[in-house]
Swiss-Prot record:
Gene disruption phenotype: RNAi-mediated knockdown results in disrupted clearance of intracellular pathogen N.parisii from intestinal cells.
Biological-process GO terms, alphabetical: intracellular protein transport; lipid droplet organization
Positions with a binding annotation for GTP: S20, G23, K24, S25, S26, D37, P38, T43, G69, K126, D128, A155
Annotated gene: rab-18
Modified residues (Cysteine methyl ester): C203
Name listed for the protein in its UniProt record: Ras-related protein Rab-18
Record InterPro entries: P-loop_NTPase (IPR027417), Rab (IPR050227), Sigma_54_int_dom_ATP-bd_1 (IPR025662), Small_GTP-bd (IPR005225), Small_GTPase (IPR001806)
Motif stretch (Effector region): 40-48
An example Gene Ontology CC term for this record: endomembrane system
Species name: Caenorhabditis elegans
Reactions the enzyme catalyzes: GTP + H2O = GDP + phosphate + H(+)
Family: Belongs to the small GTPase superfamily. Rab family.
GO MF, one example: GTP binding
SUPFAM superfamilies: P-loop containing nucleoside triphosphate hydrolases
Residues annotated as transmembrane: none
Length: 203
């Protein structure tokens, strides 16, 4: 994140999706405010935070939408996805059901996203927990099949949290069609080795 007061290069809309209880709000709050609440309440509808970060020397403003995972809020789905440039899909490595429902979330992204080349990041959360039931290999295989970035993280210990957002934003900036409508002459340099190829976060 950046405290630079200069005008941002662009403003990006980032969604955080996944089943209820997987730690979506905890990931967002750890990234934005560097706090962790083990008793974090379930999101009602949508939570919304604005922050900024520096990418390749440019300040990028982020509008982060933390969406509710409960079925009763799904009627609001189309408005959530409209105009988003990036989506973070979270599952809980201690919950097999949250992993098995990833197909549903990927279908929802494909159905409602208005940007065909939206950048997707799969996050395996709660890797600090001892009762893990979803392996790293399973997560990587799913991410590869759906052509998404992949990282393991813990909102509690902070592991992987900063990298999740950095890698996602770098990929978006490297895809000017997603955000560069008003700046036709501006292009960042070539992707770095840590950001190219594969589905793994290189942080």
């Amino acid at each position: 994140m950046s405290d630079d007061s200069s005008s941002p290069l662009t403003t990006l809309k980032i969604l955080i999706i996944g089943e209820s209880g997987v730690g979506k709000s905890s990931l967002m709050l750890r990234f934005v405010d560097d706090v962790f609440d083990p008793e974090q309440a379930a999101t009602i509808g949508v939570d919304f935070r604005v922050t900024s970060m520096a990418i390749d020397g440019n300040r990028v403003k982020l509008a982060i939408w933390d969406t509710a995972g409960q079925e009763r809020f799904r009627t609001l789905t189309p408005s959530y996805y409209r105009g988003a440039q990036g989506v973070i899909c979270v599952y809980d490595v201690t919950s097999r059901s949250s992993f098995e429902k990833l197909n549903h979330w990927m279908q929802e992204v494909d159905t409602y996203c208005t940007n065909d080349n939206i950048i997707k990041m799969m996050v395996a959360n709660k890797i600090d927990m001892p009762n893990r039931v979803v392996t790293r290999e399973e997560g990587l295989k799913f991410a590869k099949r759906h052509r998404t970035l992949f990282i393991e993280a813990s909102a509690k210990t902070k592991e992987g949290v900063q990298c999740t957002f950095e890698e996602l934003i770098e990929k978006i900036i490297q895809t000017p069609d997603l955000w560069d409508n008003d700046r036709p002459s501006f292009r960042l340099g070539q992707p770095t080795g840590s950001s190219g190829g594969g589905g793994m976060c290189g942080c």
